[in-house]
């Protein structure tokens, strides 16, 4: 019984997905994570891999999670998406449902948003 309890405690105290740092709560129907080990620095620009994990399947694509490579402009407070991959399961698991490697246009981030939180996180590195 003690061994079972020890295993349960060890599993509960260890991170479920190494590398992912939770950046937002579930308030908006999804939780956003960033992997600090993937941050690439080029002057005022930062690239990072993010994971957007949805409570329910996305209404547009039916995916439960999206892996995103984003580029942040620390000086201008803006972001663009460089790459996206859509997955049927949570936390990037399951079948790959598609994706995009077409970079989006830059767009500004407003203070207090989840994107602003990510900008501050990656730009502090």
Where are these regions (language model features)?
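Sec-dependent N-terminal signal peptides
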Residues: 4-12
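N-terminal secretory-pathway/extracellular module detecting exported/lumenal segments
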Residues: 15-125
């Amino acid at each position: 019984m003690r061994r079972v309890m020890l295993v349960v405690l060890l599993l509960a105290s260890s991170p479920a997905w190494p590398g992912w740092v939770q950046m937002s709560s579930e308030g908006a129907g999804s939780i956003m994570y960033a992997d600090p080990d993937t941050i690439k620095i080029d002057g005022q620009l930062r690239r990072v891999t993010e994971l957007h994990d949805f409570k329910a399947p996305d209404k547009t694509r039916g995916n439960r999670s999206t892996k995103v490579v984003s580029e942040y402009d620390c000086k201008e407070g803006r972001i663009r998406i460089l790459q996206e991959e859509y997955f049927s399961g949570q936390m990037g698991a399951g079948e790959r449902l598609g994706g995009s490697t077409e970079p989006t246009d830059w767009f500004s981030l407003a203070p207090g948003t989840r994107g602003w939180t990510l900008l501050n996180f990656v730009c502090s590195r």
